Amino acid sequence: MSGSNGSPRDLKAGGSLRGRVRVPGDKSISHRALLFGAIAEGTTTIEGLLPAEDPISTAACLRSMGTTISPIQSGEIVTIEGVGLDGLEEPSEILDCGNSGTTMRLMLGLLAGREGRHFVLTGDSSLRRRPMNRVGQPLSLLGANVRGRDHGNLAPLAVQGQRLRGAVVGTPVASAQVKSAILLAALTAEGSTSVIEPAHSRDHSERMLRAFGADLEVGGEMGRHILVRPGATLKGQHVVVPGDISSAAFWLVAGALVPGATITVENVGLNPTRTGILEVLEMMGASIEVLNRRDVAGEPVGDLQVSHGPLKAFQFGEEIMPRLVDEVPILSVAACFCDGESRISGAAELRVKETDRLAVMARQLKAMGADIDEHPDGLTIRGGHSLKGAELDSETDHRVAMSLAVAGLMAEGDSRITRSEAAAVSYPTFWDDLERLRR
């Protein structure tokens, strides 16, 4: 399987997949461990941190504000010397968030309450097109001052640190990024802050903030109401990052689709706010077993074993979307090989990811001959037709690149994928792992 950075990668169709694989550390948890470690007192050590572009962007921003963070390398424990809750310095340079929406959105919350300090955040051309008002607007209820293009919606963004005051904030969407930005800002506010979500989003921030010593309560129906009381000192911790279920999803779907396949994905985070993918695979009739369930540093973890079998069409919508939003691209590939018509709805959020993922997946799968209709909030896919090898393009999106790799395995005839290196944003060793499992 050829393809170096910038050159098209050949995807050979056919063959099977067998073996064990360990996916990189969870991206969401990696970002949060870096951010909370930076504003804690004392040393934080992180085991299993994802050594990919997005967390590296978060670390670079924190270093620019005076935080000492050891190099981020595969297999190495990362050490952070915390500067305390109000110890971040005004940087002398613009903070570059790269391609990482999580970095930019969480930084807005982290920096909003740094009174008297000024910060400018930017990112690559894709990130500069992504909406930031969904964070800036709720933060303004606490007194934050965020300015930028399109009335503060588009980067570059300027944050003028303010004295914040606690508030009751209802978030417009069930987004862990929005919620986490408000929680970070609330740590430096005067008075308590309550965050109320329309639906329960991933809860890594709440779990980890409590482990670091924040005064935080979770209540309401399904944990949709979070209360933060400022004033508690965060203390450095040892954080163990489990494997990212969003990266495991590619192997789970591939194992279910590819004839003769049996794959075990080891050490996967099974936080219940992230396991929507397992429910949809179950709905499809996929053969998946959870082995060796355990708890690691406050997060449920297990090994997932998947094997090939016949799959039936599925439907899901907004009720489950916060728990599998990143898995929609690979599930759209799965739908092409299910018996019947599958429908994904409530997924309008995907139009403002690294790319418009609904449009990109529809475009790329149609190039392979898929029977697929695009809707404002989702996709309808009629399965049971063969896909044909084609010239494909990730359109710079990491999840699209890896989803198309799985489609390419199942196609009749070989494919080529342009910009396959995008996978490195969340899974730097994806193509190597694919080669190994094919042997």
Curated annotation (Swiss-Prot):
Its EC number is 2.5.1.19. CDD domains: EPSP_synthase. It is found in: Cytoplasm. Pathway: Metabolic intermediate biosynthesis; chorismate biosynthesis; chorismate from D-erythrose 4-phosphate and phosphoenolpyruvate: step 6/7. Phosphoenolpyruvate binds at K27, G101, R130, Q177, R357, R399. Keywords: Amino-acid biosynthesis, Aromatic amino acid biosynthesis, Cytoplasm, Transferase. Gene3D superfamilies: Enolpyruvate transferase domain. GO terms for cellular component: cytoplasm. GO terms for biological process: amino acid biosynthetic process; aromatic amino acid family biosynthetic process; chorismate biosynthetic process. GO terms for molecular function: 3-phosphoshikimate 1-carboxyvinyltransferase activity. 3-phosphoshikimate binds at K27, S28, R32, S175, Q177, D326, K353. It comes from the Bacteria. It catalyses: 3-phosphoshikimate + phosphoenolpyruvate = 5-O-(1-carboxyvinyl)-3-phosphoshikimate + phosphate. The active site is at D326. Catalyzes the transfer of the enolpyruvyl moiety of phosphoenolpyruvate (PEP) to the 5-hydroxyl of shikimate-3-phosphate (S3P) to produce enolpyruvyl shikimate-3-phosphate and inorganic phosphate. Belongs to the EPSP synthase family. Monomer. PANTHER family: AROM/DEHYDROQUINATE SYNTHASE, PENTAFUNCTIONAL AROM POLYPEPTIDE. This is 3-phosphoshikimate 1-carboxyvinyltransferase. It comes from Synechococcus sp. (strain CC9311). The gene is aroA.
